From Swiss-Prot:
This is 1-phosphatidylinositol 3-phosphate 5-kinase fab1. Component of the PI(3,5)P2 regulatory complex, at least composed of fab1, fig4/SPAC1093.03 and vac14/SPBC25H2.03. Vac14 nucleates the assembly of the complex and serves as a scaffold. The PI(3,5)P2 regulatory complex regulates both the synthesis and turnover of phosphatidylinositol 3,5-bisphosphate (PtdIns(3,5)P2). Catalyzes the phosphorylation of phosphatidylinositol 3-phosphate on the fifth hydroxyl of the myo-inositol ring, to form phosphatidylinositol 3,5-bisphosphate. Required for endocytic-vacuolar pathway and nuclear migration. The product of the reaction, PI(3,5)P2 is an important regulator of vacuole homeostasis perhaps by controlling membrane flux to and/or from the vacuole. Coiled coil: none annotated. Residues 763-804, 1346-1371, 1457-1504, 1522-1544 are annotated as: Disordered. A zinc finger (FYVE-type) spans 60-119. It comes from Schizosaccharomyces pombe (strain 972 / ATCC 24843).
């Protein structure tokens, strides 16, 4: 991770901040200083040895002792004089200083104090820098032996280049098409979380202030006009050793190569002229470059380098210097007459511009050069060249106005006359008016209309009227608004006075930023408050004004063009105060020292001396004698202002007097006295240095109020000064962008005129007091301000009654969105009249949700809808109730989101007090990054950066472009980047909903000669065309880079003036800047801002889900009713009276059947009527009440079963009777059959006969099942048993009976039919199933199957059990039979005989062998009968009536006891037999249920003979059969069977198969299929609850337990005891207070509930019952919690790596996670702290992203009948994505090790960290700054809480919905603690014993917390919105 560098500004030249800065202003090499001093007027100091003249030495007779050590001089101790101060010292106090400082060989003698001064002023490197400079210059000269003036000017070459512009240049359409900027991405290996995010070093440039170095330039060659000629530093004149590296914004400390430096303007102007040119050439260059450019709207970039391009600029601009005075009151100014011969008497304010001591009119060299320039232009000025040249750089409107026809006047003078004539008409269309600053007050817009003048007017003048009008109107309204906000009296008078002053100031001021001036113009504008007078007395001073009394009353109070000396050293005589000295000696020495010092100063011939320290009175006396006015005790800042405005050197030490310091000057000096308090008569004197260069600085004087009022005005004016200057630069930018400026000015002015003046009103009394006076002054003021009159009246009239806003200290309420929105739309908040900021995104959202919420409340009749979604109204009350429910739910969702956003807005609003003020618009916050073009991975950032406009964190647009283009090979700063060059990277700035990408590209300048100038053009992305090329003007070069980005982000209305394009210039164009054969591309793209959702405090129920569930349940239960009653109808229809022989019974049987049909019809009507009534009268959310119909249905089915049992007993023969008949027939067959027949032929014959006789009743599924039977049979006899089963199943056709069963969607029971039902590994003997009855008929059966897999021991058995269920319904006695099969019983006997098998030789065999074979068949039938008995028992269970639950409850107060009480039982319970379980059972419901079973069983034939099989009857009385009970193995039987003789078929006898088949068919006709009951063997229902317990849905047991009456009563008891305890403590609170106390209980109650239903044992243990109940009540989900848990299904989410089993409730509201033993222990230990933390979330609004846990339970289900054994720990938590459909889901841990899965595109697929990183490479995820702050706060709080509990391995689940642009987040899996195994693994890996990966796999909780925070902060990025003063701060 790259360290973030905080930029620190280099030591600035201005302003001076420390006491040593004034000294450091002279830290330059003496050699260069002496060279520069040749052009300065020399003093009359006698310097024969270039040191202090002996005239200023102290006389030898003055002292006989050393001035420093007081050592007496002797013959051997000589006197020495300091060559700097002139004191007499001894050799021990003597130091030698390098002589080259004073341009001497060797060294000079100085005293120790002077030597220390030299050391302080000149560092060691600077003392010896002259030698380095000489060698460097020598090297440069060797590289470039000759650089002549002709080469530098190269007029012909440049002019010929411009000659190529004969036609307007247009960029080709295919040149540099704007590619789509790749989106920023997050590096997978690191993040910049530790970055402070403010003012990153790679954004900003250090151009404004730099450290001084030896390579200085002369002020005569500089554009800045700065006060110190010895210390001017240029931006590019430094070599590699002098470039500042402590503040490296773009170049990262790298220096461009010399070849590029040489191309730079400032370098070529300063260094080349000094190093390579002769004195004459330098003078010529200086004379040429001294013109005042002013504010020019031609696209000519000024340059000291004397090209013809610059000459034209000089010609265009110089003649427009007007003779105008400043706004200073001149009545108190008088000429002093102290003028010098080289100064003109002209009052021209441009007299001292640009460092010149001469007037332009007196400079013959300039005039001569100007004539040469005009001649050169005329020489090249043919008609086509001149017109096309101007067309290339002037706006089209200007060119059309200048050249109305194709005929261009010959020569420049004619063109100028035409130009001036037209301009004169523009400026004075209807007569004469008082000119505005642009109409004669400013040199930039002044017009010399003399016919003798040959000039070209700058295009700016063409719209000076509209510009002045626009700016004055905008500034006036802005001032009026801000003055009202501050409560300033008489705001309208200020509005009428200040705009003109501010406009003139902005137009005149022009800091030279290239030479080191600050880009903040406020550094050079001082605002002085002088109480008293009137507001109209405010004035502007083009110089400095400061408060200072005169040192002497006799001194002059006014001077013209004084010479000014600035001193910062002390004039006092310094002596050792700790020594005892003679007072007379000290006085004499002091006097002589001061006299000499004053004489030395006066030799410079100053008129004014300003000293920082105190001046001794004797010195003041001598100054007065010399006619010098001296001021002392000046502030350092005042000296700085004087030095800059008057261009004077600050003399910081005595030695500087020997270096010919430069004295400053001004046009006029005066002392003026003002009355500041009329009541007290207080007066104050001010010194005024006026008529200095306008470009260097000025002072605005405020008058007309008291000090407090003026302080408020000063604060406002300081900002408006910057705004006025910014508007000037912005207009230049728009002009360079080819915007139609006159049209823009007109439309903007009209918009401003229509805009009202809302303000934070003052009191009505104040307005009424000042209104009369303001109206009087309106008539005489400027017309541009008159529209403010009506607005002022309207504002004043409304402020007294219903002002839209209060005072600024009484802002509108945070929920008054309409007022806030109106104020933000109507108030002036930006620096520009062309720009309006959008409303804060958060305000738009909360306003929108409030509107929708109110609309729903008004237009929709809502149902009562609690936060949990419990609908109270019944469905029968409203026809459109479903639609109303949906509207209610929609309202709840909107209301919930509205309140959430409202809280965020309130917090945001509280930190945004300056939202309604322009003071909030002084900065912009960006998300900044440097991104690799190829990989899209950011090398720097993304990080939040602050840009303060026109401050040190900002730079100019020109600086940014030049530095970027000159530093293409600079490293990007990325730690892992392989291509470090910035040419392969781009910068990205994200703000609001946009992103600006800045690309650096290679580019060949299309116009030769413009490579060294910044050219501009743009490309429309929609029109696919380029605009014309233009050269960047100087004003555009100074435009703020931060404001340029803001302009691109916010402006979308301004269009260019080209006909082919009507799109927004700033928003929809790609902007190009070319410089040095490089192009910088600015491209704006829109980004998607996602809405962020954290887990809500309250849960909700979507009525559509509830409605869907209820509808499904209604249809399912209706099908159950239909199926059960259909089974009764089928039984009734199959009843026959054929076996009834008694006529009396026959009639009663017929009447009984008729009665059955009547009762069935009555049951149909009753059940459906009751069911529909339950459905209609229950609430929409209550679908469990529908289960109550099952209890009614179950009772009716029990009655029907009893009726048919009675019917069978009365009218039908028993099984025993039928068996006797069949046995008699079989005996007859065997007695008549010959013994030669092989017994083994019987099964084969039966099998073959089955296939032949019943082909139509064999389905494919039946064949498959039969095949499975032969493969999986586990009976002892592996050959005979299949035959027996086949014979038993032959007569079981399936066509009619399953026509009803196929409509069922209820699964069959999991029944084990083996002998030992307690054994798990059991297999069915005959698993024949019906193909029509499949699991597919029940939609959720597959999900419920998965639940059984929760128990690892039941995984294999569960699958087999399901096969048992289907087999049980289709085998043996329970197989239904159709009437067609019954009809065939008689026909079977008469069917054709079977074909005989191939004859086998007959053998003798005994009758006993034959009997043994039949006995084997009998054994198989007995086994089948046992299985049928088991099924009958299961069926009997279903026939039992529903009884109360009667649970056994155990209460635990000790957590460990509650958690471990079942360990011993768990170990042994699985192997218990059914009998042991029944013996150990202590359930109270056992006796009652046993009695019920006995009652039911008593009605059946349960005697030993009741089920005696046919073979028992057949061989019952035969003797000798007992000996055959021990069967032989099948292999042995095969051997014996092979010996049996075979014979032919029995043609005469009836086969045994026919007899048996007829027997089974008859029996099945007498015993039709069993009834269908509403409950399955795996379903359990009790009479005291509507919840059905399902063995494959563990949540149903939890739901049943929580809804049991006993549990509810215990919760009431706990709450009552809590209330009683609080009452005893004297604490009474609301319901929330009680809930909070329940959650904070130190101990919890743990309950264990045990139920028994039939053979099933059900147990549920509830942990922390009252705490979780209170938590659910706080969330508002307690009422619906039971309903949601009633049904669940297996939830399989692919992609995740947790390996845990999950269940999801049918309503998708809750997730159930199956916990391991270790996780359960962690959860129970973690629970108390969790309740404490979550209570702060509910009741103290603590931000959190933790998903809520609603309960922890242990479920134990054991049912031997179905083979179910399920014991598991279940944690119930909320579903983060409830009612949402995220497109992608991510499980994020902040690690990149093994955090990648292959995406399959499945629903609910969970992806990991690396998948997210791959995604955000292409499409980063942005949220608003406020929501990102919320997420940051949530993650900070949650991770801190979890780390304190030693918890780790938690994840942030993130769902992204690209359709709705929403982001859902929540922390899950936060129950894993840092256990000893993790610690050991971490220690081993830290020691390097195993694993050598890039990052540790096991970390501590603290490390995990930090890594998690950093990663999440990097995954989700924030886009800063509307910045309001203080901004939105992180809530950490």
């Amino acid at each position: 991770m790259s360290e973030v560098e905080t930029p620190t500004a280099a030591s600035p030249t201005f302003p001076v901040e420390t006491s040593h800065r004034l000294d450091t202003l002279h830290t330059s090499s003496t050699e260069q200083i002496i060279k520069d001093s040749e052009n300065v007027v020399h003093t009359t100091l006698k310097l024969p040895t270039s040191t202090l003249s002996r005239e200023f030495w102290m006389k030898d007779e003055r002292t006989n002792n050393c001035s420093l050590c007081e050592t007496e001089f002797t013959l051997f101790r000589r006197k020495h004089h300091c060559r700097i101060c002139g004191k007499i010292i001894c050799k021990y106090c003597l130091k030698e200083a390098p002589g080259f400082i004073f341009r001497l060989q060797g060294s000079i003698k100085v005293c120790r104090p002077c030597a220390s001064i030299l050391v302080n002023n000149y560092s060691r490197s600077q003392l010896f820098n002259h030698s380095l400079n000489e060698s460097k210059n020598r090297d440069l000269t060797e590289q470039h032996p000759f650089v002549t003036l002709d080469e530098l000017n190269s007029n012909d070459q440049v002019l010929s280049s411009f000659g190529d512009l004969s036609s307007t240049f247009e960029m080709p359409n295919n040149i540099h098409p704007p590619e789509v900027a790749p989106m920023i991405a997050i590096p997978s290996s690191r993040s910049n979380y530790d970055s402070p995010g403010w003012a990153h070093h790679s954004i900003f440039l250090d151009w404004s202030k730099r450290n001084l170095d030896s390579n200085v330039i002369n002020v005569e060659d500089s554009e800045s006009g700065k006060y110190n000629a010895l210390t001017i530093t240029n931006s590019y004149d430094a070599g590699p050793s002098s470039v500042s590296t402590d503040y490296r914004p773009v170049n990262f400390g790298k220096v461009p190569s010399y070849s590029k430096l040489r191309k730079n303007k400032a370098f070529s102007s300063a260094k080349v002229s000094d190093m390579y040119l002769s004195a004459d050439e330098r003078n010529r260059l200086e004379d040429f470059s001294k013109g005042d450019r002013g504010l020019s709207f031609v696209n000519l970039s000024p340059n000291i380098k004397a090209t013809s391009y610059d000459r034209l600029s000089t010609v265009i601009n110089e003649p427009f210097i007007s003779r105008s005075s400043s706004l200073t009151d001149e009545r108190g100014l008088a000429d002093s007459g102290n003028s010098y011969h080289h100064f003109s008497d002209s009052d021209d304010e441009s007299l001292f511009n640009d460092g010149l001591g001469l007037s332009f009119h007196a400079n013959s060299a300039i005039i001569k050069q100007r004539q040469q320039n005009v001649a050169s232009i005329q020489r090249y000025g043919n008609e086509s060249y001149l017109s096309n040249f101007l067309k290339a750089f002037l706006p089209k409107t200007v060119c059309d106005y200048l050249f109305p026809s194709s005929t261009i006047p010959d020569g420049l003078p004619a063109l100028i006359e035409n130009f001036n004539a037209r301009v004169d008409k523009v400026n004075h269309p209807g007569g004469t008016e008082e000119p505005l600053p642009y109409q004669g007050k400013s040199r930039a817009s002044s017009v010399v209309t003399s016919s003798k003048s040959t000039c070209i007017l700058p295009p700016w003048i063409l719209f000076s009227d509209s510009f002045n009008q626009l700016v004055c109107t905008f500034l006036g309204k802005l001032l009026f608004q801000m003055l009202n906000d501050e409560g300033v009296d008489s705001p309208m008078q200020w509005v009428l006075c200040l705009p003109k002053i501010l406009l003139k100031m902005a137009l005149d001021l022009g800091p030279d930023i290239r030479s080191g001036d600050d880009i903040d113009v406020r550094s050079y504008v001082k605002i002085k408050k002088i109480p008293g007078g009137s507001i109209q007395d405010c004035f502007l001073v083009n110089g400095v004004l400061f408060s200072k009394k005169a040192s002497s009353k006799s001194m002059d109070r006014s001077l013209r063009r004084p010479r000014i000396a600035l001193l910062t050293f002390s004039l006092d005589y310094a002596c050792d105060e700790q020594r005892i000295l003679s007072l007379d000696l000290i006085i004499s020495q002091q006097e002589e020292y001061i006299i000499n010092l004053v004489n030395r100063i006066c030799m410079l011939k100053p008129n004014l001396v300003f000293a920082q320290g105190q001046i001794p009175s004797i010195a003041l006396k001598y100054f007065e004698e010399h006619g010098v006015i001296a001021f002392h005790g000046l502030k350092e800042s005042v000296l700085y202002d004087i030095a800059r405005c008057c261009r004077a050197d600050i003399i910081s030490s005595i030695d500087k007097l020997s270096l010919c310091p430069r004295l400053g000057t001004c046009g006029r000096f005066q002392l003026r006295t003002y009355v500041v308090d009329e009541n007290k008569g207080l007066r104050k004197t001010f010194a005024i240095l006026d008529r200095c260069s306008e470009r260097l600085g000025c002072t605005i004087v405020l008058r007309g109020a008291d000090y407090n009022q003026l302080s408020k005005v000063k604060k406002i004016v300081e900002l408006v000064v910057l705004i006025a200057y910014h508007i000037k630069l912005e207009c230049a930018l728009l002009r360079d962008k080819f915007v139609n400026m006159p049209e823009l000015f007109e439309t903007t002015y009209q918009s401003l005129s229509r805009k009202s003046l809302p303000s934070f009103a003052s009191t009505a009394a104040d307005k009424e007091k000042s209104q009369n006076h303001e109206k009087k002054s309106l008539n005489s003021d400027n017309q541009s301000l008159r529209p403010l009159e009506n607005e002022n009246q309207s504002v004043s009239s409304t402020q007294g009654s219903n002002s839209p806003l209060e005072l600024i200290n009484n802002l509108p309420a945070s929920d008054d969105y309409s007022s806030i929105t109106k104020a933000l739309k109507t108030r002036f908040l930006t620096f520009s009249p062309f720009l309006s900021k959008p409303l804060p995104r958060l305000l738009n959202q909360v306003n929108y949700y409030q509107f929708i919420r109110n609309k729903l409340l008004k237009d929709v009749k809502l149902h009562p809808y609690s936060p949990t979604g419990s609908f109270v109204m019944k469905q029968s009350e409203n026809d459109n109730v479903e639609e109303s429910y949906e509207e209610s739910y929609k309202f709840f969702c909107i209301d919930e989101r509205y309140h959430f956003l409202e809280k965020q807005w309130t917090l945001y609003y509280s930190h945004s007090k300056l939202m309604f003020s322009p003071f909030s618009s002084q900065r912009i916050i960006l998300l900044y990054s440097i991104i690799n073009k190829e990989t899209s991975v950011p090398c720097i950032g993304p990080e939040r950066c602050l840009l303060e406009f026109y401050r040190e964190t900002d730079c100019t647009l020109g600086q940014y472009i030049e530095d970027s283009c000159l530093n293409t090979n600079v490293s990007c700063g990325g730690e892992y980047c392989k291509t470090n060059d910035m040419l392969w990277h781009y910068r990205s700035y994200v703000h609001g909903n946009s992103r600006i990408s800045v690309f650096l590209e290679s580019f060949s300048c299309p116009v030769p000669g413009l490579e060294e100038k910044i050219i501009m053009w743009s490309y429309c992305k929609f029109c696919k065309k380029n605009t014309h090329i233009t050269v960047m003007s100087e004003e555009t070069w100074k435009y703020s880079f931060g404001k340029y980005l803001e302009f691109m982000f916010y402006n979308s209305q301004i269009r260019d003036r080209f006909e082919f394009c009507d799109h927004s210039v700033m928003a929809q164009h790609v902007h190009y800047f070319g410089y040095c054969n490089m192009a910088l591309r600015f491209q704006r793209d829109l980004i998607e801002i996602f809405e962020l959702f954290v887990p809500s405090v309250t849960l909700r129920n979507n009525p559509s889900y509830i409605k869907e569930l209820k509808e499904k349940e209604y249809k399912r239960l209706k099908g159950v009713i239909e199926k059960c009653l259909s089974s009764v109808a089928s039984r009734i229809n199959q009843i026959k009276c054929d076996w009834v022989t008694d006529p009396e019974k026959f009639e009663s049987c017929t009447s009984e059947i008729s009665k059955f049909r009547t009762l069935l019809s009555s049951d149909y009507t009753e059940l459906y009527s009751e069911f529909d009534s339950i459905y209609l009268n229950s609430s929409t959310s209550d679908y469990l009440s529908l289960n109550s119909i099952l209890r009614v249905l179950q009772g009716k089915m029990v009655k029907w079963e009893q009726r048919f049992l009675d019917y069978q007993r009365l009218y039908l023969p028993s099984y025993k009777e039928l068996s006797k008949i069949a046995a008699a027939q079989i005996k007859k067959v065997f007695l008549e059959r010959p013994l030669s027949q092989t017994p083994l032929d019987l099964p084969e014959t039966l099998e073959n006969t089955q296939i032949d006789i019943y082909p139509s009743f064999k389905t494919e599924s039946t064949d498959d099942q039969l095949e499975k039977v032969t493969q999986t049979n586990v009976a002892s006899n592996k050959r005979v048993a299949p035959y027996a089963d086949s014979m038993a199943n032959v007569g079981s056709p399936e066509s009619d009976c399953f026509s009803v069963a196929t409509s069922s969607d209820i699964p069959k029971a999991n029944i084990d039919f083996t002998n030992d039902i307690s054994t798990q590994n059991t297999f069915p003997a005959s698993p024949v199933s019906n193909s029509g009855f499949s699991r597919q008929t029940y939609p959720n059966i597959s999900q419920r199957q998965g639940v059984n897999m929760l128990s690892h021991k039941r995984k294999s058995a569960s699958t087999s059990d399901r096969r048992f269920v289907n087999a049980s319904s289709t085998s043996g006695m329970n197989m239904p039979i159709s009437s067609s099969i019954s009809a065939k019983i008689s026909s079977i006997q008469n069917s054709t005989k079977y074909s005989p098998r191939k004859p086998i030789p007959a053998k003798d065999v005994r009758v006993s062998s034959l009997v043994r074979r039949f006995e084997e068949l009998s054994l198989q039938l007995q086994e089948k009968q046992k299985r049928d008995e088991e099924l009958i028992k299961a069926r009997r269970k279903r026939a039992l009536p529903v009884v109360p639950s009667k649970p056994v409850v155990e209460v635990f107060n000790d957590l460990n006891e509650a958690f471990d009480d079942e360990n011993s039982e768990d170990e042994n319970g699985i192997n218990d037999t059914k009998e042991n379980r029944a013996t150990e059972s202590n359930f109270s419901g056992v006796d009652s249920m046993s009695k019920e079973r006995e009652n039911v069983s008593s009605n059946e034939d349960n005697s030993p003979e009741a089920f005696e099989d046919i073979f028992g009857i057949l061989f019952k009385n035969e003797s000798g059969l007992e000996e055959q009970q021990n069967l032989e193995p099948s292999s042995q039987m095969d051997k014996e069977g092979s010996k049996l003789p075979t014979s032919g078929p029995l043609a005469d006898k009836t086969s045994v198969y026919r007899i048996l088949s007829a027997f089974w068919n008859e029996w099945n006709s007498l015993n039709p299929p069993p009834f269908e009951f509403p409950l399955q063997p795996t379903e359990h229902m009790f009479s005291d609850s509507n919840v059905i317990i399902r063995e494959d849905e563990p949540s149903s047991l939890i739901s049943f337990t929580l809804s049991s009456p006993d549990y509810l009563s215990k919760m009431v008891e706990i709450e009552d005891s809590m209330d009683e305890a609080l009452t005893n403590q004297g604490l009474q609170g609301s319901t929330q207070f009680k809930i909070e106390n329940l959650m904070l209980k130190p101990t919890g109650t743990h309950l264990k509930y045990q139920f028994e239903e039939g053979s099933a044992r059900l147990s549920c243990k509830v942990f922390f019952a009252e705490q979780f109940s209170a938590l659910r009540r706080a969330c508002g989900c307690e009422e619906t919690f039971v309903t949601s848990l009633a049904r669940c299904s297996l939830w399989e989410s692919s992609g995740g790596k947790s390996g845990s089993a999950f269940l999801k409730t049918f309503d998708k509201k809750y997730i159930l996670k199956v916990l391991s033993r270790l996780e359960s222990d962690s959860l129970l230990n973690f629970a108390p702290a969790y309740f404490d933390y979550i209570s702060k979330v509910f009741f103290h609004e603590l931000p959190t992203a933790l998903t809520k846990i609603f309960g922890f339970y242990r479920v134990d289900i054991r049912n031997p009948t179905t083979g179910t054994i399920c014991k598991t720990d279940i944690m119930i938590m909320e579903n983060v994505f409830y009612d949402e459909c995220p497109s992608r889901i991510f499980d994020l841990k902040g690690s990149m090790r093994n955090r990648h899965v292959e995406s399959t595109g499945k629903v609910d697929e969970v992806l990991l960290d690396e998948n997210l990183v791959e995604l955000i490479y292409e499409s980063p995820i942005f949220v608003s700054e406020q929501l990102k702050s919320l997420l940051h706060s949530c993650l900070w709080n949650d991770t801190l809480f979890l780390s304190k509990l030693n918890i780790m391995d938690y994840s942030l689940i993130v769902g992204i919905d690209y359709t709705k642009k929403e982001l859902y987040v929540g922390i899950i899996d936060f129950i894993r603690t840092y256990t000893w195994d993790k610690k050991l693994e971490s220690w081993v890996k830290e020691k390097g014993l195993v694993g050598r990966g890039p990052e540790p796999t096991i970390v501590t909780p603290k490390q995990y917390k930090n890594r998690f925070r950093k990663a999440m902060d990097c995954y989700i990025l924030a886009s800063q919105d509307f910045e309001t003063g203080e901004g939105f701060k992180f809530c950490e």
